[in-house]
């Protein structure tokens, strides 16, 4: 088995690069020999993954955060199928949020991610697909393993991206601080949406999300009923809600007990389309590539994931 490890040294505000020698040694002990490739800029992981698979690599391990894993995933998938049907994808989480692995009951440190690879089995999981409006106003496609969302979460991404505190706060505290800061300035927004092949409906919402995994935003248990291989996305729409009431309910989102809140609309779906006359920001696996209009779909069991 030919293995390539693709590392984002900038993940976790540069922490991954600093501890890479330790991760490298641990990987050698657990998975044997491998070739290492390091990214230098955004988008590199997509291209490196695609080139590796086209060259016959059968196992790729992503080392970095949720955004890096998403890039590797987007190198894995082409035209809604795996580029190489036999290849497997593993991961070592060492970024800011590290949310995806929580859905697989792997705790937050990189050592547990590495240890999990030693005796990992291949599990076929679903992959989400978003056809969205990019920042240059063109239509683009992006796949996601965890959660795609819009509204407040996208604004939180922007807040974190431009804050110096990202160099000092840990993942969970950073996302919590950014959420509280952003909710005071980010309004409820009007969207028009369609679930599966149902009728067009209107709603004012502060946050909408389509979940394959269960956690996002640095350990928020946003979609407690989501399953990675059920062929469905968990749709949550946070209806029009005041800032005070949102902050009152925020602890419930971390606990996963928020589905009972009257302002939360929940349904399992296969497809969801949303548009707005306002600028509604997207968040896809922790990155913000564009805006609504967007269509979210599920691709059942197309990814060979090592878990």
Q: What kind of feature is each model-predicted range?
A:
Residues 78-206:
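Catalytic core of DAGKc-family lipid kinases
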Residues 8, 66, 128, 156, ...:
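A residue-level signal for conserved active-site and pocket-lining positions in enzyme catalytic cores
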Residues 195-197, 202, 221-222, 227-228, ...:
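ATP/nucleoside-binding phosphotransfer catalytic cores, i.e., glycine-rich phosphate-binding loops
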Residues 1-63, 70, 74, 111:
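ATP/NTP phosphate-donor binding region
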Residues 149, 153, 209-223, 288:
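Glycine-rich phosphate/pyrophosphate-binding beta-alpha loops
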Residues 17-19, 73-76, 102-104, 221-222:
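Short amphipathic alpha-helical segments
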């Amino acid at each position: 088995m030919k293995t390539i490890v693709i590392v984002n040294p900038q993940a976790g505000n540069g922490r991954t690069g600093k501890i890479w020698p330790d991760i490298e040694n641990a990987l050698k002990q657990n998975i044997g020999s491998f070739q290492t490739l390091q990214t230098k800029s955004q988008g590199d992981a997509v291209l490196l993954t695609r080139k590796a698979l086209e060259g016959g690599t059968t196992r790729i391990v992503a080392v970095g955060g949720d955004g890096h894993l998403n890039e590797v995933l987007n190198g894995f998938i082409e035209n809604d199928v795996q580029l190489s049907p036999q290849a497997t994808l593993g991961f070592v989480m060492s970024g800011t949020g590290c949310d995806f692995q929580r859905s697989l009951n792997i705790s937050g440190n990189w050592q547990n991610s590495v240890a999990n690879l030693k005796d990992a089995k291949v599990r076929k999981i679903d992959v989400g697909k978003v056809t969205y409006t990019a920042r240059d106003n063109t239509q683009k496609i992006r796949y996601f393993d965890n959660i795609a969302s819009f509204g407040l979460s996208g604004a939180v991404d922007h807040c974190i991206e431009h804050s110096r505190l990202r160099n000092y706060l840990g993942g969970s505290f950073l996302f919590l601080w950014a959420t509280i800061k952003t909710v005071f300035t980010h309004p409820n927004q009007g969207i028009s949406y369609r679930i599966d092949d149902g009728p067009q409906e209107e709603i004012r919402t502060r946050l909408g999300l389509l979940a394959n995994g269960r956690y996002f935003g640095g350990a928020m248990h946003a979609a407690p009923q989501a399953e990675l291989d059920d062929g469905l996305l968990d749709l949550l729409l946070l209806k029009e809600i005041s800032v005070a009431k949102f902050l009152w309910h925020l602890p419930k989102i971390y606990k996963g007990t928020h589905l009972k809140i009257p302002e939360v609309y929940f349904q399992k779906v296969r497809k969801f389309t949303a548009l707005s006359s306002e600028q509604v920001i997207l968040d896809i696996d922790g990155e913000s590539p564009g805006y609504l209009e967007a269509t979210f779909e599920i691709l059942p069991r197309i990814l060979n994931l090592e878990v």
